Amino acid sequence: MSNNGSSPLVLWYNQLGMNDVDRVGGKNASLGEMITNLSGMGVSVPNGFATTADAFNQFLDQSGVNQRIYALLDETDIDDVSALAKAGAQIRQWIIDTPFQSELENAIRDAYDLLSADDAEASFAVRSSATAEDMPDASFAGQQETFLNVQGFDAVLVAVKHVFASLFNDRAISYRVHQGYDHRGVALSAGVQRMVRSDLASSGVMFSIDTESGFDQVVFITSAWGLGEMVVQGAVNPDEFYVHKPTLAAGRPAIVRRTMGSKKIRMVYAPTQEHGKQVRIEDVPQEQRDIFSLSNEEVQELAKQAVQIEKHYGRPMDIEWAKDGHTGKLFIVQARPETVRSRGQVMERYTLHAQGQIIAEGRAIGHRIGAGPVKVIHDISEMNRIEPGDVLVTDMTDPDWEPIMKKASAIVTNRGGRTCHAAIIARELGIPAVVGCGDATDRIQENQNVTVSCAEGDTGYVYAELLDFSVKSSSVGDMPDLPLKVMMNVGNPDRAFDFACLPNEGVGLARLEFIINRMIGVHPRALLEFDDQEPGLQNEIRELMKGYDSPREFYVGRLTEGIATLGAAFYPKRVIVRLSDFKSNEYANLVGGERYEPEEENPMLGFRGAGRYVSESFRDCFALECEAMKRVRNDMGLTNVEVMVPFVRTVAQAKAVVEELERQGLKRGENGLKIIMMCEIPSNALLAEQFLEYFDGFSIGSNDMTQLALGLDRDSGVVSELFDERNDAVKALLSMAIRAAKKQGKYVGICGQGPSDHEDFAAWLMEEGIDSLSLNPDTVVQTWLGLAELKK
């Protein structure tokens, strides 16, 4: 296995570590590092061997092909797509036509014989590992080849030759030039690894960090049926899971969010060993598309392995995993540094100032917005049609397209998930991308002007016109001390990890309405009485609740995930979750809701808040919210989550709702539970001391308080100019509430819009002695710094 005592041509993974990157590249060095150091810590990596950089360089040198390669590259204009394609094809053919020296062929044969000794029909993965690949400043993102289900020595030898040639793929040549790498300084190592039979199970990619926000307290896992190449390439829309690291470390259920992907196709073994045809793609049966491709226990097991790998490397990691269909065992097949977040973070906020017609939606990559004319590209041969500033719309953006991706103002694809190669490249280039839209190439027209927004959460939108947007950059260090806490209003769990990276002291208002509306979408009564619904409605609900065991579990489970995401994002800081405050017309708009909601002239003043919770017609629906709260606090241990009750009209209602919460297992003081009341009706301030007997504090809702104090409909344009939280009557009521809470030593904050809109109002509240301001995320830094200036 060595070259007559000189530098080895082949090395086993258990002989390798991260100090061998220059010999076997980042990918193979990392596999060796894990086998050597993490095998005893629950991290399983299939065995294998690697050809060395010396083997590659000797192969090029002794054959003389290297001189032809570098001469051709030196005279080729890399930015000329056609010239690049012609040169790349010529170089790859030269390498494939060049025979291996006998020493290298024999070294590979010896290693292969040992690796396959226990199973003559074993199959192997043959992967590339470039000596500059997977360094923290160079995300080569699959620019070299991988060959799967390679059986027999001759097939392995052919695959190694093609791996060597792949160092000169068009995308790899282009990438090296634009990243400043010298072609002569990069070599290739081929890794030969025993295959995990994930063609019979599932596989995917995971990150030990949230890829979009850089939030480092979660593991993000993607999964689909079959071999992992489909997820990596972006050919399928995979299942997604978020696992909260502190909850996992505490030994509790730690999955805070699950999203089911369509998983329409999978890659499996093919019956032939003809090179390049050892795998095939097939449709996934509908019954498998409609279930998650990993169990909750498997998700948590993978997350534990990710945490161990991250801990060992001391940095966020990008990890490929596979489940063996024969044994059910989970394996790690690759691990590399996560590249994008390591580059440092400038706080950059993109804001869309208008809404337009949505023509496509999918998974948002990044948080930026791009706009421009559309180019619908159906085939790589059309690459030269892309001009700088175009929006690239295609079925899936293979990494071969990297030379043109950097020209685009945005990228939109039919297929792909947030861990595919295209998503990684888009993040690295700082280009917004919306992937997995399904039918974008049909719905978006050539040369149509569109706006692509990734600034609205996990879902990215393509709008049918050029919309106004802005970007605000700021550099934030340590924030100055204030006599109050600056908290945040958050409704969309999709944005929670992003917002948690802003300066904050917790969440003063987490709304359930977004979760119920967008993540569930069905009236709770329609789920509780599912069997009584008409067949058409039942089918609509079944489509929404895929992956959940029952209609009730769908509601409670989705609500639990939404609340847990908010609680985990800001853990261990305080997160005050307001129970649902839909009005009857809003509940009626949910699927199945019209049947159960009254027609009201003014729903704003009707059947809402605490009165709804204790009514006979809604009590068992309210129990579902309480069940979700209990799971988050008691099962998952996210006791930083507190409960807030909205729209409590009378003291008797206050007493009744607290008793109902206790009946549902949410007893004030038990397991540290605090119950806060929204102070948003004049009666709440006028009788503040009586209301506070039943609660642990107030959160002032200045929006409702203003409209009720001044007799305004805040949704009416006719009287909107009179709506002002700074009105003396409103301020008098707020002062009463603040003083009453202070007198009893209880918490008092504000979560209404006022302090976000009016810095002078925020300053007045600070002088009044309020404990916290809960602001819109986009005003947190500005208001915080502004108040600090006033205190000087």
Where are the model-predicted features located?
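Acidic, glycine-rich flexible loop/linker segments
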Residues: N66, E338-R343, M347, A360-A364, ...
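Beta-strand scaffold of nucleotide-dependent catalytic cores
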Residues: A138, L148-V150, A159-V160, S202-T211, ...
